[in-house]
Amino acid sequence: MTKQKKDQRAADGAGEGSGSQQLLLTIDVEDWFHVENFRQIIHPSSWPSFESRVERNTYRLLEMFSEIQMPVSVNYERSFDFHNNYTLSYPRSPLPGVKATFFILGWVAERMPRLVREIHSLGHEVASHGFNHELAVQCRLEDVKSDIIDSKKLLEDIIGGPVYGYRAPSFSINENILRLIEETGFMYDSSYNTFSANSRYGKVDLSGSENVGVAKKISSGFYELPISNIQWAGLVLPAGGGGYFRLYPLCLFALGVRMMLRKNSAYVFYLHPWEIDYGQPRVREASKLSRFRHYVNIDKTMGKFSAFIKRFENYRFPTCRQYIDGL
C-alpha cells in the first residue's frame, strides 16, 4: 500500500479500533410495502397483492456479509434461483467475522421460512420484529402481547431453537410494552431510540436501570439495547442508521460513529433490506416527505453499507445476543 493510500485510510479512520470495540449490525427484515410511511396508502389487507422483494434483498445482505468475512481459501456454493434468474453464492457454514442480528417480521417468516433458516445456518442471529408491523403504542396491550408471542413461536419453530431478542416496528415502545416483552421470555429488547423528534418512536424511562456497556439492565435476565445516537450539547443527533445513514455523507456518518466509540465499547446500527433496493416500486401517491424519507439516496445504500463496514474492519461484529452474553 502506498504512503498516500495509508494516509487517506488513516484520515478515514480505517484500521482504527481494538478487539474490545464492537459494532452491532441489525437488520429489520420487512418489505417495502410494510413501512409506516406508506400505511395511509397501502392497507395491510392488500400486502399479498404487491411484489415481494425482501427475500432477494436479504440474500444480497447475507452475501455481502460473507464476502467481507471471507478467509483466503473457501469453497462457495450457490443458493437457489430467484425470479428473474437472480442467484447468490456464499459459504454454507458459519464463519467468524461479520455477524448481524436479523429482526424478522412474522409476516415475512411465515411466507419465507427458508430465508429464516438460511440466516440462522450462516451464524447470524434470528430475532423478532413482531408479526404484523403495527405501531405497538397505538394497539391494545392484549393485541401487542399476541403479536409478540405469535412471532416468537413462529421463529422458534422455524429455527428449532430459542429467540432471544425483539424490536418493535418503528421503535414504537413504552414501559408497558417493555414489560410485556420481558414477560414473554425475551432476553433483550432493542426498540428504544432516544431521538425524540420522530413522533413514531416510543419513550421509556430507563433512568433507574444499570448501565452495562451500551445496554440497560432492566432486571437480572432482561436488557434494553438502545439504538446508538450522538449526545451533543444537550441534544440527541440521530446516528443509528436507516434513513439517517442514507442521508449523511459516509465520511460524516463514520466520524459520528467513531465519536461514539471513543466513549462507548459498542455501537448499535440498523438498516432495512428495502433500503438497498433501488428497483423497488415507487409509491407516487405518498406525500413528498414520505417519499423523501423512503427513497433518499436509496441507489447508493448497498455500496455505502459495504464501505462503512470495511472502515471498521478492525472492530468486532457480534450479534446482539453475543454482545449481551459478554456483559
Language-model segment annotations:
Residues 2-165, 170-232, 252-327:
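Catalytic alpha-helical scaffold of carbohydrate-active enzymes acting on polysaccharides/glycoconjugates
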